[in-house]
A protein has these predicted regions:
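P-loop NTPase motor module signature
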Residues: 1-234
């Protein structure tokens, strides 16, 4: 087990996800796979790792937390570290291509989905982790689709591994069906024909705290030397 100082955890009361934290924690405790659905701005990205830490996750293995973009991996790591009062790179670290700010004490590891995909090539069982969060699963990138498919097959072989998926509400049913029959209830029964064990709980977090404006970047020529490197998914 990795040793790290016990982080001090509190939840900003203005975030919609804070009101749902007991329901989320109960679902994670009782199920191997949980889906948290809600709009951008609900706080799920920053608060889920803290809920998991309170449940004792991240000790036998790290909490791996994927983001679709490199910039998000860093800024989310910074935010969580600030909220638990820990320097970045200690309890909370981040890893993207060419940058690795993860230490021996790291319990929560932010990364792009491309980084986790590369780690699958080297460690098929993902032994480094006791929990995986796939954030923004509705983005439906090739990386995310491959990871979800791979994890669905891995979970029966790693009954100790928990998977939390976040998504916009629109895509929840598709994702839940994808994992029905692949996960286990806390009592050890697998899904399939075993009734309730196959059901993946969906916790809906309603509302958003901050107004979110969606802006679309212009298409960038990949041969353009001035192209934005943040578009590289890994």
């Amino acid at each position: 087990a990795m040793l790290a100082p016990e982080p001090v955890i509190s939840y900003p009361p203005e975030l919609p996800v804070s009101a749902a934290r007991d329901e989320i924690a109960r679902a994670i405790r009782d199920h191997q796979v949980v889906i948290v659905a809600g709009a951008t701005g609900s706080g799920k990205t920053t608060q889920l790792p803290k809920i998991l830490l309170e449940l004792g996750r991240g000790v036998r293995g790290r909490i791996g937390h994927t983001q679709p973009r490199r910039l998000a991996a860093r800024t989310v790591a910074e935010r969580i570290a600030e909220e638990i009062g820990s320097p970045l790179g200690e309890t909370v670290g981040w890893k993207v291509r060419f940058t690795d700010e993860v230490g021996d004490k790291t319990l929560v590891k932010l990364m792009t989905d491309g980084v986790l995909l590369a780690e699958v090539q080297r460690d098929r069982m993902l032994r480094q982790y006791d929990t995986i969060i796939i954030d923004e699963a509705h983005e439906r990138s090739l990386n995310i689709d491959f990871l979800l498919g791979y994890l669905a097959r891995l979970l029966p072989r790693r009954p100790d591994l928990k998977l939390v998926i976040t998504s916009a509400t629109i895509d929840v049913d598709r994702i839940a069906k994808h994992f029905s029959g692949h996960s286990q209830h806390q009592d050890g029964h697998s899904g399939g024909d075993d009734g309730d064990g196959a059901q993946v709980p969906v916790v809906e977090v309603s509302g958003r705290t901050y107004p979110v404006e969606v802006r679309y970047r212009p298409v960038i020529d990949p041969d353009d030397p001035e192209a934005d490197p943040d578009r590289d998914q890994t």
